Amino acid sequence: MQRNRRIEYLEDGRCRMTWNDVSARQVLRRIFDAAVASADPKIAVVNNLPERPRGRCVVVGAGKASAAMAAAVDAAWPDVDLSGIVVTRYGHAVPAGRIEILEASHPVPDEMSIKAAEKIFAAVQGLGPDDLVVALISGGGSSLLVSPTGKMTLTDKRAVNQALLASGATISEMNTVRKHLSAIKGGHLARAALPAKLVTLIISDVPGDDPSEIASGPTVADPTTLADAAAIIARYGIDLPESARAVLVQGNETPKAGEVAGEIRLVAAPSIALEAAAAAALDAGLCPLILGDALEGEAREMGRVMAGIALSARDKGLPVAAPAVILSGGESTVSLGAMTEGRGGRNTEFLLSLAVALKGASGIWAIAGDTDGIDGVEDAAGALVAPDSLIRMRDAGIDPRATLSAHDSYTAFKAIGDLVVTGPTLTNVNDIRAILIG
């Protein structure tokens, strides 16, 4: 690592270590990979398993990490009377022995999302007090586990999801709406599992790690109300199908505290991932500064704000002096407004906005990506930004500002070869952003 850095002597005789492009890119990728590795289900799940049941064990689950979590449970308990079924995103399945793995669509549900919900709901019914239900919940479960309520159809559910994703609502707000339009989310699955013992193992992808929000809380009492959901729809002017509007007016409330029981264990989370990223930064000789694991807001606005922080760190040593890395987690949003044909997720949009705001500033590199390996609906986890990113984009015929306005950030980073492609990581602790100031 030392050969990729050099000593720069300042006018007052002081010296500082500076970074070249190769070393900065390598370190940023190691930082991102360390964050992902901290949420490896094989380790996180096994270390948090409950006591073995006297009766049967039924494993259910939903999310991008659910198949890998299920495989860990099956391998850890070879002598337990165990069966089950979980649903994960297409392309994220792995063999899990006695536990059936289904795949469904994300972020917009399909027919398999409904079939998975039906099978999982049936699997937890008819159990006794000596039986154990282990629920494996991770990000993405909201679209993978779908049980329309009222007169809603799959087409209606898809329309709701698409409207929510384009609205600019936070993930918490979107999940509040989803819970009140579902017969399985918002604690309904926990109610169905009674009187069996219920233990939920969660890999969190939501800011603040609220278990009632992760995958829309199928096994957790719901603190939100129908009125809350209706207020969110009004606040963002979201156009819902008539069947969905009827549910918000006439539907039944989700189970509340005292109506369902169960133990919740958080096995991996954004905060843990950021600590792992910080440790990797220290190993590389960088001073890590964690801004928080729950940053939210418009991706392009977040990019502009982060550019200001990075420039202040480089020029003034505030809020941290170079060499340093500024870390953050959480989930930004992208408000599309009128439909566009642009490609890209929230992380590449954040990075393109950051690059535009930095205007090619020297000594600053950045990486941002979704820890599940998929930024939005694209085939990349995210991308990298370097001081020469804008120049290389223009050389490739890309106008960075126009591309940002068109929400076409994926195209910009693909043109310069700076997408970060990991493939499905089989876990999900939301987004990780790291800005290196050399």
Swiss-Prot record:
Induction: By tartrate. The keyword Lyase does not apply. It is an enzyme of class 1 (oxidoreductase). The keyword Signal does not apply. Signal peptide: none annotated. Pathway: Carbohydrate acid metabolism; tartrate degradation; 3-hydroxypyruvate from D-glycerate: step 1/1. Gene3D superfamilies: Glycerate kinase, MOFRL-like N-terminal domain, MOFRL domain. GO terms for molecular function: glycerate kinase activity; hydroxypyruvate reductase (NADH) activity; hydroxypyruvate reductase (NADPH) activity. Its EC number is 1.1.1.81. It catalyses: (R)-glycerate + NAD(+) = 3-hydroxypyruvate + NADH + H(+); (R)-glycerate + NADP(+) = 3-hydroxypyruvate + NADPH + H(+). Disulfide bonds: none annotated. Keywords: NADP, Oxidoreductase, Plasmid. It comes from the Bacteria. One of its GO terms (cellular component) is cytoplasm. Degrades an unidentified toxic product from the first step of tartrate degradation. This is Putative hydroxypyruvate reductase. The gene is ttuD.
